[in-house]
Amino acid sequence: MNKKVGFYGGKFLPLHNGHIYSILYSARKCDELHVFLFYNTFEEKKKIEESVFPKKLLTPQTRELALKAEFKNYSNIKIHSIDSEKCFNNTNDNENIRWDSESKEVIKIVGCEPNIVFSSELEYEEFFKKSYPSAEIVVIDAKRKLFDISATEIRKNGEMKCWEHLSKAYKVLAAKSIVLFGEAALKRKIVTDLTKLYQTTCVEMYNANAEKLKNELLKARYNSNKIFFINADENNIKDFEEFYKEQDLCIFFENEKYFEILKNIKCKKISFENTFEECIKNINKLLL
């Protein structure tokens, strides 16, 4: 019996559950599935420039990491990436020639011509027939009946509106971080209540060090629900100033004692009157 070697390719801009379904479906139909990420395509730059979805999460490195994270426990799924720009050297803008260049690189990496090719797009069927003449072509859920989502829609609407469609790897990366500054005794209850309200996680900065913080952040992101909180320690703000500057939202419960120490960190200042409600209003803006 001949070994079934499969091919599934895409840009994964970004990886979503429609892609995941297609890859899992494909892997069940063959002995060995080679998933290819194509990046630096002619149209990719424009798509990223116009994206509402965070551009920093659409780099080739991030897309490849997301694919590898999702399928690391599947022994018959192999992840590869191809720099399409390098394939197109000495070619012109003719789409047939570009596809031919990419398919030659695919065959080189796989070690043979795939005998079964999977796609989620009907429009690519003719290209695949020319590029892999000996292969069976299988089109998966082309009308999006099982997963009514596309990477185009996610880029257009952003990560929060399309959260349920993102892969787990992308949810971990796209979760928004919210830092809460203020005196410990005064904000403890607020931090607890906000974490409960948004059904998410919180990182405590008290007695933090670089290694501990790295592990706690990863854990918080992995278990978060769109957002997660960082409870700042008023005693080590200066030590972690650069870290705080990188977060998505900083909220400062006004206290004259901290005005000077927080002057370099962009914060939303909230008085202790109606603090809980004001926090919610600012947090909800991140979720739009």
PLM regions and their residue ranges:
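A charged, solvent-exposed segment within the mature domains of Sec-exported extracytoplasmic proteins
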Residues: 216-220
